[in-house]
Amino acid sequence: MAKIMIQGTASSVGKSLIVAALCRIFKQDGYSVCPFKSQNMSLNSYITLDGKEMGRAQVLQAYAAGLEPEAYMNPILLKPTSDKKSQIIVNGKVYGNSTAMEYHNLKIKFKDMLKEQFEKLEEDFDIVVMEGAGSPAEINLRDRDIVNMGMAELVDAPVLLVGDIDKGGVFASLAGTMLLLNEGEKERVKGTIINKFRGDVEILKPGLDMLEDIIHIPCLGVVPYTRLQLEDEDGAVEFNKKAYAPIDIAVIKMPHISNFTDLDALKSEEDVSIRFVTSKEEFKEPDLLIIPGSKNTIEDLLYLRQCGLEERIKEYSREGKIIGICGGYQVLGSKIKDPYKVETDLGEIDGLNLLDMETTFEKEKVTTRVSAKLLNEETKNTVYGYEIHMGISKYGENIKPLFKIYDKNGEKVDYFDGAINEKGNVMGTYIHGVFDGVVFREKIINELRVKKGLKKKKSQMYEHMREKELDKLADIVRQSLDMEKIYSIIGMK
């Protein structure tokens, strides 16, 4: 089996999309290929068909490789719960919570498991494309590294180093990274990639030659800055501004926002503009307000209270349309109870009281794939998605369920999910990915269109658009990189 690892000079330099592009290129060239990231830190996660949790970046990479996402592609997932603590997911299941120092001491225990997971891939695939995290030049973490050079050494993988020229200082970041690597690590780096370049490459070439003279490693290509409608896992980036988009959707950007990839399918609607809101001044008068998921619902509820957004949301709810997803759904209720101190020591807290329901946090985490029917007069078509939450919500009298779940991880079930108020303008659900399918997204956006005097439209399947964008990404990267050299590095040609 061939393998190659993509590392970067820093976070958000484009490692994940370079890996996705290589997965698609190798697949197009007839090879069976699999992505692998030993450890990922993200608040955007996904539930596999067998109910396991993994990072969203490896989900996109799996699709690029033509595979169903599986937790073995991302054996360790760290989900920050506060500035100092993270929930640790190992092989798709909750391992526990720990501080950074506690986890640093735990990493040695995971090394054998990671090697074993990787060796299984060697039996099933022609090529494995690995992804590092952050930078390999974090010299304070070198002795227990399991995600960058430590992982590359564990499985004897060659490395390509990616730098982001759009931020500026790409030559310094590449040269500085190489300077901080030890001799064995330097020998693993077989090439560099300049990512997110704007302009004429000819102007850049003298710098590339000088860099090669300094670090003695060839540049394998310059990838242009390109806007793609593919999900971003690393951070809640600003959405592309459209010249004219009559439908204005505001999203509350809470401190612990998670699974904001739920919004990606909405971006595919040509007449929809999405913007983040962090203050009363930014709120304005949107056509729809979305309160997204949260990794610490209680702290984010306190944030809404303290910054004045709670008052503005309640005022907007008199006439405006609101959708809460997972943690955003929980804050819409009358009360949140935390008897086991899952999130804080508060015990319980009043919600926004826009939906007649109460949520209680349990010890066990719900991670499940679901299929549901939308309960309304117009349609009973299926909605697909997944649930990731600690809370159980109970309805009051002045509320109706939004969905009926009929399939859970492949088993037939029969229970309600979500809620909608009597007026029909405030609703919420535990289902992540609820907008990915056409049914719910088309219904909601068409309601907004009609209210503004616009014609209804058919929504496109998000997965079809994603496939086109992945092919576009692969074409750009194939044209930009020396693929013959990359095949030579991995010993395939």
Swiss-Prot record:
UniProt GO molecular function: ABC-type vitamin B12 transporter activity; catalytic activity
Record keywords: rRNA processing included? Answer: no
Concerning SUPFAM superfamilies, the annotation shows:
Class I glutamine amidotransferase-like (SSF52317), P-loop containing nucleoside triphosphate hydrolases (SSF52540)
Pfam families noted in UniProt: CbiA, GATase_3
Domain of life assignment: Bacteria
Gene3D superfamilies for this protein: 3.40.50.880, P-loop containing nucleotide triphosphate hydrolases
Query: Mind listing the GO biological process terms from this record?
Result: cobalamin biosynthetic process
Q: Which UniProt keywords apply?
A: Cobalamin biosynthesis, Glutamine amidotransferase
Active site: which residues?
A: C326, H432
Matches recorded under InterPro entries: Class_I_gatase-like, CobQ/CobB/MinD/ParA_Nub-bd_dom, CobQ_GATase1, CobQ_N, CobQ_synth, GATase_3, P-loop_NTPase
Biochemical pathway: Cofactor biosynthesis; adenosylcobalamin biosynthesis
Q: GATase cobBQ-type domain: from which residue to which, for each copy?
A: 246-440
| Family in the record | Belongs to the CobB/CobQ family. CobQ subfamily.
Protein's job: Catalyzes amidations at positions B, D, E, and G on adenosylcobyrinic A,C-diamide. NH(2) groups are provided by glutamine, and one molecule of ATP is hydrogenolyzed for each amidation.
Instruction: Please state what the protein is called.
Output: Cobyric acid synthase
